Amino acid sequence: MTVDSKPQLQRLAADADVDRMCRLLEEDGAFILKGLLPFDVVESFNRELDVQMAIPPPKGERLLADKYPPHFKYVPNVATTCPTFRNTILINPVIHAICEAYFQRTGDYWLSAAFLREIESGMPAQPFHRDDATHPLMHYQPLEAPPISLSVIFPLTEFTEENGATEVILGSHRWTEVGTPERDQAVLATMDPGDVLIVRQRVVHAGGGNRTTAGKPRRVVLAYFNSVQLTPFETYRTMPREMVESMTVLGQRMLGWRTMKPSDPNIVGINLIDDKRLENVLQLKAADSPA
């Protein structure tokens, strides 16, 4: 793929100005944050994911995993199984500064899903697509509608052209349809572990093919933050109560354990019980608010 002749993904420091990040989302549709996650966080997260990868797949119905080819491994629900994700990555202040600005027209937001994909050698490139398959409503939004979904891509191994770094078509969030783009319209999101790729709703992108013949698979965790007006793809309501109460208030909000507030004219919120706040009815404690 020839990438030198076209504008590339902007790469920002993790402490860059949030207004600049949001401008890039509106102008380009995506950008990379360099070194957002420290090495020890990435290392801890990878160890926890190694444990999950070693568990034999459950018997019975697997609605999504069974649709993947054999050289594509999938681990769902990392918010429940990986403490590093739910207690550190999920509440990262930079990610939430971006989300608060990004979702300001639609109100509160929460996590829709977070799962691991491990892509081994021989996996072909994905077709170009938008991240709207879980909630087809997004496909019918007019271009001028405020965004209601944000994709956050965490590389946990190196992303290179050879092992299938994500391919992003800058500015494609302004297209009316995905169509059939050529691969050379995209730019490569080559990244190191700890970097993060932030992708605006409607941006056309694809995972590249893994053309390596040896070495580790490409490992990535995909997290999707949606307006609370959309039902999450994964539910976290089956998490043990003691696990939930070990989290911060923000973490609990992201996983649907507290009442949330869309934008006006909604005046009371959603996720209510008997016209009361969910957390009050449950008498829910939190790590940063025990009483």
UniProtKB/Swiss-Prot annotation:
Catalysed transformations (reactions): fumitremorgin B + 2-oxoglutarate + AH2 + 2 O2 = verruculogen + succinate + A + CO2 + H2O
Biological process according to GO: verruculogen biosynthetic process
Keyword Iron: yes
Active site residues per record: Y68
Entry keyword Nucleus: no
Database matches in SUPFAM superfamilies: Clavaminate synthase-like
Known cofactor(s): Fe cation
Biochemical pathway: Mycotoxin biosynthesis
Enzyme kind, highest EC tier: oxidoreductase
InterPro entries documented for this protein: Phytyl_CoA_dOase-like (IPR008775)
Molecular function GO terms recorded: dioxygenase activity
Keywords attached to this entry: Alkaloid metabolism, Dioxygenase, Iron, Oxidoreductase, Virulence
Enzyme Commission number, as recorded: 1.14.11.38
Subunit structure: Homodimer.
Family: Belongs to the PhyH family.
Main function: Verruculogen synthase; part of the gene cluster that mediates the biosynthesis of fumitremorgins, indole alkaloids that carry not only intriguing chemical structures, but also interesting biological and pharmacological activities. The biosynthesis of fumitremorgin-type alkaloids begins by condensation of the two amino acids L-tryptophan and L-proline to brevianamide F, catalyzed by the non-ribosomal peptide synthetase ftmA. Brevianamide F is then prenylated by the prenyltransferase ftmPT1/ftmB in the presence of dimethylallyl diphosphate, resulting in the formation of tryprostatin B.
Protein's UniProt name: Verruculogen synthase
Name of the gene encoding the protein in the UniProt record: ftmOx1
